[in-house]
Amino acid sequence: NLEEKITLKILRNTNIVVSLGGGGFINEKIRNQVLTNHFSFWLNWNSEILLSRIKSSKKRPLAQNSTNQEIMKLIKKRSKIYSKAEFKINCNKLTKTEIVKKVIKIYELN
């Protein structure tokens, strides 16, 4: 898989920030590499917020032909895997700036 190969190559670097998007952390090889060698953050929003964002995005190929129920099922399934991240940030009531500040603070403390 080309995405896996490229991502694993990128993850060999240090002092980088990588946003893995929807499916990256789902991949077991990628997830293991991240959890072993890097800080990992789960930026968690409630399911309704995620559903709204996914449905309104034109860049979400899985959502184009999916029902709300199917998307919610996928969110629930993926959340179980995302929750394996080292750090979790509840983003429901945070601005982008507040989220960035939290990530930086956690990084600096570790």
Stretches with model-predicted labels:
Residues 1-35, 60, 68, 79:
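ATP-dependent small-molecule kinase phosphotransfer cores
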Residues 5-6, 49, 98, 102:
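Alpha-helical elements of Rossmann-like donor-binding domains used by nucleotide-donor carbohydrate transfer enzymes
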Residues 13, 39, 76-110:
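NTP-dependent small-molecule kinase module
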Residues 20, 43, 91:
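Catalytic metal- and UDP-sugar-binding loop of GT-A-like glycosyltransferases, i.e.
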Residues 22-25, 46-48, 94:
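Short glycine-rich anion-binding loops that position phosphate/pyrophosphate groups of nucleotides
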Residues 29-32, 52-56, 101-102:
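Short amphipathic alpha-helical segments
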Residues 37-80:
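A glycine- and Lys/Arg-enriched "phosphate-lid" helix/loop adjacent to the NTP-binding pocket
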